[in-house]
Amino acid sequence: MDYMIFATVSVALMLSSISATSIAVAFPIITSYFMVPLTIAGWIISVYQLGFTVTMPIIGKVSDVFSRKSTFILCLVLFVSASTACAFVDNVGLLVFFRLIQAFGGGGFMPSAVGIISEEFPETRQKMIGLFSSILPIGQIIGPNVGGWLVDSFGWRSVFMINLPLGAVVLLMAIVLLKGDERKEGSIDFLGAGLVGGVVAFLMLGLTFLGYDSLKGWSWALFLASAISTALLIRHEKGAKDPILDIEILKRKPFVAANLYNLIYGGAVIGVLSLIPAFAASVYKMSASECGLLLLPRSIGMIVASIITSVYIMRWGYRWPLVLGSGATVVSLYFLSKEPASIVFLYGIMLFIGMSVGVISPTANNACIELLPQKAATITGIRGMFRQIGGAVSVTIATLIVQTVGDPSRGYAIVFIVIAISFVAALPLIFMMPSRPGAGIERSECSLKRLKPTTKERVQ
């Protein structure tokens, strides 16, 4: 039964993965359909990351406090309903809105599922979470190829409609198989989540407005609003009963290092690499089906590397796989920035990128949880939030650069080089994170004893 539960949450994550990669393939067609600038169309992708940013830490807390089964099912219903609505809109503004709602559902899959897996497999948590991470590239194999075929055969709306029958099957599995659990004490920091969303949204809007002469004046006001929201967030979180961002924990170097690394990782993998189909369509003149096929070697590389890393992570530790994966990503981005090469060479680069990401993902996941394993779902939500912030902001910056430069080939080259440099700058952060399984637990427990008590604890 435990492995059937693992299969249920894994299929849900795969559904989210299929949806994300299908949209990446459909993105050039959707941009042409609505006839909007790239910076506006980019919100179809970046608003999804924004929704994840707000939702993941909330759902992590909700999953820790309330029933994991109810939380998981609620997220699934929200995701499928919004996906269906996206298929019927005829306005880019409405599409962006329903993509945000879709993200509110999809953003809950990972933290709630990790909480479920951590409870079902306490003795083999590292291995099972690593295997769970390998589900993402399976969806990334199916999504681009099926999505490319759907777009070429039935139009871009079909990539949203496919979530309805698949989601219904997963919903039935969840209702039947998942175990109910008792409510625990705690509260949800909705204001904190709203302030996090405000910080990122104001920053993204400010960056978008920089691309328009008539709106540039508003950019600085939006940047100021983002800064003010940041100050309000810090002040609120210091006094919150159950803060969405525990400021005292985030002051500790290992948590700071882990989250900054995930911010950069999200900017590259969730953000910029989601624009690969748009890059291939504009620079290499590929069709939707060809763009989908281009993502196949990346997904295969992710699966193979993720499974191998998950199996041997107890032996290898965390740091050197992260160094290896980061270095390989830098090399891949450098070659992507060069003049358009042969299609075969491009496929090779995508395979190499996939292997790099496959090494990084399960390692970074477990390195974060290692710092506070008793709060696995919450830590997963915070880690995911930083990744999504990186992804959302990087898409906004990337589309601004490409639109400003004018030449897609040169614009994307600049984007790839910027991300490569950020990965090089992030290498020292790896050596501030736990070195191996078990290394962070004792330090975390000792450090947590020295942390200031929450408002709730002071009252008690």
Could you describe each region identified by the protein language model?
Residues D2-I18, I23-F27, L38, G42-V47, ...:
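12-transmembrane solute porter fold
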